[in-house]
Regions:
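Short, charged surface segments at domain edges that flank catalytic/cofactor-binding sites
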Residues: 1-28
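Generic alpha-helical structural context detector
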Residues: 5, 57-60
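Generic signature of intrinsically disordered, low-complexity segments enriched in small/polar residues
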Residues: 7, 20, 30, 39, ...
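Short cysteine-rich clusters marking metal-coordination/redox-active sites
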Residues: 16, 59-62
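Histidine-centered nuclease catalytic patch
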Residues: 22-58, 66-71, 78
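Polybasic, low-complexity binding patches
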Residues: 47-53, 64-110
Length: 110
């Protein structure tokens, strides 16, 4: 509950990063539509720490879909990627924008 309180304060129902509703009173309750647990952003199997900066409250189904996938995964029909930001990892929704080649011109005239 400490991570819930740190993340959401006094809120009793919120949406996780994948858009699923979780309820404070449904911690680890697989029989609840709003059941949630704590997930490692960078999986422990990949060296992720059990520290607040690497933990996120999420719906049990979201956690099941993410599992130990790294760096990309799908949850609730949405694509996500785990990226390193300074000294920690974050979950970001993937965008459909094509990546630009380094030093490639913005436009090409013919």
């Amino acid at each position: 509950m400490r991570l819930w309180n740190k993340s959401f304060g006094k809120e009793t129902k919120v949406k996780d990063f994948a858009g699923r509703t979780i309820a404070k009173g449904a911690y680890n309750d697989r029989n609840s539509d709003c059941g949630w647990n704590v997930d490692h952003i960078l999986p422990q199997s990949r060296g992720g720490a059990t520290a607040d900066h690497n933990l996120v409250c999420c719906h049990i189904l979201t956690n099941d879909e993410k599992a130990d996938k790294f760096p990309c995964f799908n949850a609730n029909g949405v694509s996500f990627e785990i990226i390193k930001v300074q000294n920690h990892y974050e979950i970001r929704q993937k965008t459909n924008e094509p990546k630009k080649q380094k030093d490639a011109p913005e436009t090409v005239d013919f």
